[in-house]
From Swiss-Prot:
NCBIfam families: rplV_bact. InterPro entries: Ribosomal_uL22 (IPR001063), Ribosomal_uL22_bac/chlpt-type (IPR005727), Ribosomal_uL22_bac/org-type (IPR047867), Ribosomal_uL22_CS (IPR018260), Ribosomal_uL22_sf (IPR036394). It comes from Gracilaria tenuistipitata. It is found in: Plastid, Chloroplast. PANTHER family: CHLOROPLAST 50S RIBOSOMAL PROTEIN L22-RELATED, LARGE RIBOSOMAL SUBUNIT PROTEIN UL22M. The keyword RNA-binding applies. Belongs to the universal ribosomal protein uL22 family. Keywords: Chloroplast, Plastid, Ribonucleoprotein, Ribosomal protein, RNA-binding, rRNA-binding. This is Large ribosomal subunit protein uL22c. This protein binds specifically to 23S rRNA. The globular domain of the protein is located near the polypeptide exit tunnel on the outside of the subunit, while an extended beta-hairpin is found that lines the wall of the exit tunnel in the center of the 70S ribosome. One of its GO terms (molecular function) is structural constituent of ribosome. GO terms for cellular component: chloroplast; large ribosomal subunit. Its main location: plastid.
Length: 114
């Protein structure tokens, strides 16, 4: 007898957000039900919430494609990894330039069936 497990996952890559600030929001929704997490993200005022909500909805739609119902889903894993940093220069006085690093991150959300 084989145990068939399907992976319900959505990933957002090269998102122009700080990894630390994104993790702060992801920790709030880990282990929650799908509908509850959507509600939490809708009313939080942090910048990453809008993008995380989009990725979570994408994962929910992936589950619908596999014939699962959204009300039975739970967020099994939600994590953010560092992406490449965009390097920019800020002109300063007397011909100098300061280097600015704009962070990116990769957000992954895994769902499981309740």
């Amino acid at each position: 007898m084989t145990n068939k497990t399907t992976k319900i996952q959505a990933t957002g890559k090269y998102v122009r957000l700080s990894t630390a600030k994104t993790r702060r929001v992801l920790n709030q929704i880990k282990g929650k039900k799908y509908q509850e997490a959507i509600l939490i993200l809708e009313f939080m005022t942090y910048k990453p919430c809008k993008i995380i909500k989009k990725i979570l909805e994408s994962a929910g739609n992936n589950a619908l494609n596999l014939k699962y119902e959204k009300q039975n889903l739970i967020i099994k894993q939600a994590f953010a990894n560092d992406g490449p940093k965009l390097k920019r220069f800020q002109p300063r006085a007397q011909g100098r330039a300061f280097r600015i690093q704009k962070p990116t991150c990769h957000i992954t959300i895994n769902l499981s069936i309740n």
